[in-house]
């Protein structure tokens, strides 16, 4: 092949055989036998080939299902603590996808689907666990908020919208969507308001639970195509939810009291075991004793509880766990902020007493790991505002006094022997 740049071939103007642009409209034109291709079309072809190769590799790697121990090892890299929950999730997810791999083989025994219920305080890692599972298995994943769902025909989101979101994640590939994972958050917020079935419509509570029943158990959902309901003449997509893994999660505030009340009723008479109301001091410890009847007492209907046979309970995060979360995971917050500062050519150092103070503040706010980012964002705001405009800062040090608000981050300059405090923006 010859490389034709700005000259003309025998006095004729040359054109790209693919896009039709002339040699004057592109940077480079490559000549072949009776054809020409420009540099822009070469780049486009490279992108197409790269995407197809990546998809083929992803599909081939998807056939190898990691063992439960391997799944837990990967979860350990992103989620601190919650050892029991990680083991429960690893086994449940492994069995689910093992069941899917066997579904084409003829067998008298049909394996049922085991959806998962995660119970744990706010910021304990429920969403992160579900996200990490989907990422390591390379399957479509979507998050739905149960508080926005209503029964069909009422203002709000229909439960079928969950499947539409899943389809959007995989470019409306129905086959891929049917192997996906759906995480429904705030599931405790759709509990019915009393133990007795309501005679009035509860469109965002018990009504939503009823609507979710078939979807979670397995049904063929009719989902509008990409155009949505604006084009009613288009055929609806039929999505079978039998093989979609549903993970429901919630904080279930107050469930620990239901569990403790049941435990306190241990028995009567001289031989009855005496139990103290103070037994479950920690919410996470109480959650470990949860029974289906407790969830029904809390406000979930029995049929809905029955569709979630695997229960994973998460512990409250203590100060030590929060400090680990700040530094140990692959995507730990301190590593993320250090990377941001590194892009400016500045080192960022967190002293151990600073990490402890951040963990204490998150505990006081009762936000768990979710509150760590907002705390760090607040203390680093002024520094991140100033540093891009300063060329000679080499290091920023954060200690306990910065977290407490009594001083500003310490900024160390390359050409100055005397370190300076970052000045807050007036």
Swiss-Prot record:
GO cellular component: HslUV protease complex
Signal peptide region: none
GO terms assigned for molecular function: ATP binding; ATP hydrolysis activity; ATP-dependent protein folding chaperone; protein dimerization activity; unfolded protein binding; zinc ion binding
CDD domains the record matches: RecA-like_ClpX
Biological process annotations from GO: cell division; proteolysis involved in protein catabolic process
Domain spans labelled ClpX-type ZB: 4-57
Positions of disulphide bridges: none
Residue sites binding Zn(2+) per the record: 16, 19, 38, 41
Record-listed ATP binding positions: 121-128
Keywords annotated in UniProt: ATP-binding, Chaperone, Metal-binding, Nucleotide-binding, Zinc
InterPro entries: AAA+_ATPase, ATP-dep_Clp_protease_ClpX, ATPase_AAA_core, Clp_ATPase_C, Clp_protease_ATP-bd_su_ClpX, ClpX_bact, P-loop_NTPase, Znf_CppX_C4
Function of the molecule: ATP-dependent specificity component of the Clp protease. It directs the protease to specific substrates. Can perform chaperone functions in the absence of ClpP.
Sequence similarity: Belongs to the ClpX chaperone family.
Subunit field text: Component of the ClpX-ClpP complex. Forms a hexameric ring that, in the presence of ATP, binds to fourteen ClpP subunits assembled into a disk-like structure with a central cavity, resembling the structure of eukaryotic proteasomes.
PANTHER family per the UniProt record, alphabetical: ATP-DEPENDENT CLP PROTEASE ATP-BINDING SUBUNIT CLPX-LIKE, MITOCHONDRIAL, ATP-DEPENDENT CLP PROTEASE ATP-BINDING SUBUNIT CLPX-LIKE, MITOCHONDRIAL-RELATED
Name of protein: ATP-dependent Clp protease ATP-binding subunit ClpX
Organism per entry: Pseudomonas aeruginosa (strain ATCC 15692 / DSM 22644 / CIP 104116 / JCM 14847 / LMG 12228 / 1C / PRS 101 / PAO1)
Organism lineage: Bacteria, Pseudomonadati, Pseudomonadota, Gammaproteobacteria, Pseudomonadales
């Amino acid at each position: 092949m010859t490389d034709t740049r700005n000259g003309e071939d025998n006095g004729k103007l040359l054109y790209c055989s693919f896009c039709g642009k002339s040699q004057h409209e592109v940077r480079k034109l490559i000549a072949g036998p009776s054809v020409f291709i420009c540099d822009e079309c070469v780049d486009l072809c490279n992108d197409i080939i790269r995407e197809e190769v990546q998809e083929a590799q992803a599909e081939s790697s998807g056939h190898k299902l990691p063992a439960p121990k391997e799944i837990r090892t990967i979860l350990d890299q992103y989620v601190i603590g919650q050892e029991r929950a990680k083991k429960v999730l690893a086994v449940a997810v492994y069995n689910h996808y093992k069941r899917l791999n066997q579904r084409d083989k003829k067998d008298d025994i049909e394996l049922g689907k085991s959806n998962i219920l995660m119970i744990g305080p706010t910021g304990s890692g429920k969403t992160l666990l579900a996200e990490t599972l989907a990422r390591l298995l390379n399957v479509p994943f979507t998050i739905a908020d149960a508080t926005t769902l209503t029964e069909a025909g009422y203002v709000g989101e229909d439960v079928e919208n969950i499947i539409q979101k899943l389809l959007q994640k995989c470019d409306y590939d129905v086959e891929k969507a049917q192997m996906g994972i759906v995480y429904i958050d705030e599931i405790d917020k759709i509990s019915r308001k009393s133990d007795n079935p309501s005679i009035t419509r509860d469109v965002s509570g018990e009504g939503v639970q009823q609507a979710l029943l078939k979807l979670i158990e397995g049904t063929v959902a009719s989902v509008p195509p990409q155009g949505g309901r604006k084009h009613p003449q288009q055929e609806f997509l039929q999505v079978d939810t039998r093989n979609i893994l549903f993970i429901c999660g919630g904080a279930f505030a107050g469930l620990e009291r239901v569990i403790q009340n049941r435990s306190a009723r241990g028995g009567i008479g001289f031989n009855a075991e005496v139990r103290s109301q103070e037994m479950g001091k920690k919410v996470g410890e109480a959650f470990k004793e949860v029974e289906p009847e407790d969830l029904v007492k809390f406000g979930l209907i029995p049929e809905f509880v029955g569709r979630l046979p695997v229960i994973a309970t998460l512990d409250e995060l203590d100060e030590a766990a929060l400090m680990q979360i700040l530094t140990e995971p692959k995507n730990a917050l301190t590593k993320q902020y250090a990377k941001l500062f590194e892009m400016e050519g500045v080192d960022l150092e967190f002293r151990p007493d600073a990490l402890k103070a951040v963990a204490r503040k998150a505990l006081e706010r009762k936000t768990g790991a979710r509150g760590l980012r907002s705390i760090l964002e607040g203390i680093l705001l002024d520094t991140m505002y100033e540093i891009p405009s300063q060329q000679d800062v080499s290091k920023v040090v954060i200690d306990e006094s910065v977290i407490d608000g009594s001083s500003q981050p310490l900024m160390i300059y390359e050409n100055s022997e005397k370190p300076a405090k970052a000045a807050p923006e007036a």
